Structures are given as C-alpha cells and as structure tokens.
C-alpha cells in the first residue's frame, strides 16, 4: 500500500474520460497558489483607438500521452488572464477565438481563487470564453490590411499542443502578422503555435528561424512534471525540441518569470512570466499605437 506521500504524487483520475488524469495533489501544491505576483496595472493614458487583440484559446482538454493515458489539461488560467488584464487595462479589448468555435478549455485547478485581478478579468471575458468565434470565420478580416487586430495572443497550458501547432488557419494568421508587422504574444507552452507556419513547408523557409524566445523547458516536461505526477505520462512531442529543429533559439533553461522581445514576438517562460509578459505587452502596444 502506498504511503500518503506516494499517493499525493499520483495523478488524480478524471472521471469524464477513459484513462484520463488531472495533475497530482502534490504537483498542484508546488505549481499553483491562491494569488499571483500581480502588483498593479497602472496605465494612466490608455489606448483609445479601435485596435483589439485576438486571443486564440484551446478548445481541447485532453492530450493523448505516449503511454496511452490522457492528460486533462487546457489553457492555464494565469497565463491567459494576467496578460489579458494588463492589455485590457491599457485599452486593448480582446476578441476570443478557437479553432472549432467551441468553448475555451481552462485548467480550473490552477485558477488563483483569491486573486482579484485574475478573477475580475475572467468574469469580464467569460461570455467570450464560453462562446468564442471560430478562427476560420474571422480569418479574412484578421489578416486584411485594415485588420482590427494589433496583436494575437496565444496563452499556454499543455492543451495548446492539441491542434493549434498543426492548424493551417494559425499558420496563415501568423504569417500575415509577420508580414504586416503586427505583434505576436505567447508564453510557456503557447510558443507551440509558432510551429504552425512550418506546416507543409520546407524547414529552410521557416519564418521564425533565428528568433530568440522564452518557452517552458522540455527538461521539466521530461523530468519533474513526470516525477511529481503533474502529467500521467510522457508528452507525445516536445515544444522546445521541435522549435529548435527549425532554428529557433531558446534563451531560458529554467522557469524564473523571464520574458523576451525579439522584433514583434513577445514570449515568456512559464506561468511565472504571466505578470511580466502582461506588462511588456501593454507597454509595447501602447508605445506602438499611442495617438
């Protein structure tokens, strides 16, 4: 019989799906908290123009792991909501889209229940999270020369691996944003979206080759995340490894809250970077679009 410590590191069964699991109680005690490091969002001269930010969320909760288990995941709420809070306070409204138009899936076990900033922005955008636009339906508008979007934001959480990196719509959107000098904001596992422009293309033509980014370290997904029961098995593929194969340079080795800007690409290393990335994104967009 397992002792309590061993049991606490065992992933928790998710009864909604066959052989599916939430993170273990022990891993959640290490990785989640009731409050974030949010320390204010002071933007005395917010943007008052018409440009918005398009947030692409994941509409799939389950990732099939190498051992045939299912990881019950989604978007990480802090990674989504803290950057949204900063940008919203800076005057940039959000539209929300998923690949299918089905609701955004959130890792509610990571929601910081005592964090008023996160809770308030969640309440504000909950209707859009529950009834997002289908990305294909707004794609023509989004990539147009007169696009209403100043930036696209792809938050993290392992659920991002379930379609976004292989999406032709995401490929077209990111290619258009690069070509038209718009901003791309992403963190943790969200940079998996940067793989989309490589779909059905030659590696030597990859548009993010040579870019420097922050991203969640593969070493944690192959090490600690398995050892403490955060995931029920090895991921089907690794984000950093695949980006590096295409010529992307990863700056961080651990997770410290590091953020980085390379041209119009803004990235962060983990949930710990959520507040920092929100500040960087708000400052960057305000400087770019100040009137």
From Swiss-Prot:
Enzyme's top EC category? hydrolase
User: Where, subcellularly, is it found?
Assistant: Cytoplasm
What's a single GO CC term here?
cytoplasm
Active-site residues per Swiss-Prot or TrEMBL entry: 188 (nucleophile)
Enzyme Commission number(s) of this protein: 3.1.2.-, 3.5.1.-, 3.5.1.124
Keyword annotations: Cytoplasm, DNA damage, DNA repair, Hydrolase, Stress response
* One GO molecular-function entry: thiolester hydrolase activity
Region annotation (Disordered) ranges: 1-25
**Known function:** Protein and nucleotide deglycase that catalyzes the deglycation of the Maillard adducts formed between amino groups of proteins or nucleotides and reactive carbonyl groups of glyoxals. Thus, functions as a protein deglycase that repairs methylglyoxal- and glyoxal-glycated proteins, and releases repaired proteins and lactate or glycolate, respectively. Deglycates cysteine, arginine and lysine residues in proteins, and thus reactivates these proteins by reversing glycation by glyoxals.
Family under the similarity heading: Belongs to the peptidase C56 family. HchA subfamily.
PANTHER family according to UniProt: PROTEIN/NUCLEIC ACID DEGLYCASE DJ-1-RELATED, PROTEIN_NUCLEIC ACID DEGLYCASE 1
Its recorded name reads Protein/nucleic acid deglycase HchA
């Amino acid at each position: 019989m397992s002792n309590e410590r061993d049991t606490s590191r065992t992933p928790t069964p998710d009864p909604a799906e066959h052989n599916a699991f939430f993170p273990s109680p022990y891993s959640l005690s290490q990785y989640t908290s009731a409050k974030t490091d949010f320390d204010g969002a002071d933007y005395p001269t917010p943007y008052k123009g018409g440009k918005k930010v398009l947030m692409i969320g994941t509409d799939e909760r389950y990732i099939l792991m190498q051992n045939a288990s299912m990881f019950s995941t989604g978007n990480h709420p802090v990674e989504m909501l803290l950057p949204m809070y900063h940008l919203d306070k800076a005057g940039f409204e959000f539209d929300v889209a998923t690949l299918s138009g089905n609701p955004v899936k959130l890792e509610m076990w990571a929601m910081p229940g005592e964090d008023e900033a996160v809770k308030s922005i969640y309440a504000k955008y909950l209707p859009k999270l529950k009834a997002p636009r289908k990305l294909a339906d707004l794609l023509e508008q989004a990539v147009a020369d007169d696009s209403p979007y100043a930036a696209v934001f792809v938050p993290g959480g392992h659920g991002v691996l379930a379609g976004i990196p292989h999406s032709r719509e995401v490929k077209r959107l990111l290619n258009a944003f690069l070509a038209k000098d718009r901003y791309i904001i992403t963190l943790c596992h969200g940079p998996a979206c940067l793989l989309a422009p490589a779909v059905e293309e030659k590696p030597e033509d990859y548009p993010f080759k040579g870019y420097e980014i922050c991203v969640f370290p593969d070493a944690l997904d192959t090490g600690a995340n398995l050892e403490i029961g955060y995931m029920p098995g090895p991921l089907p593929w690794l984000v950093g490894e695949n980006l590096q194969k295409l010529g992307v340079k990863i700056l961080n080795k651990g997770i410290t809250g590091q953020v980085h800007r390379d041209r119009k690409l803004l990235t962060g290393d983990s949930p710990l970077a959520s507040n920092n990335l929100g500040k960087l994104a708000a400052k960057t967009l305000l400087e770019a679009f100040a009137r």
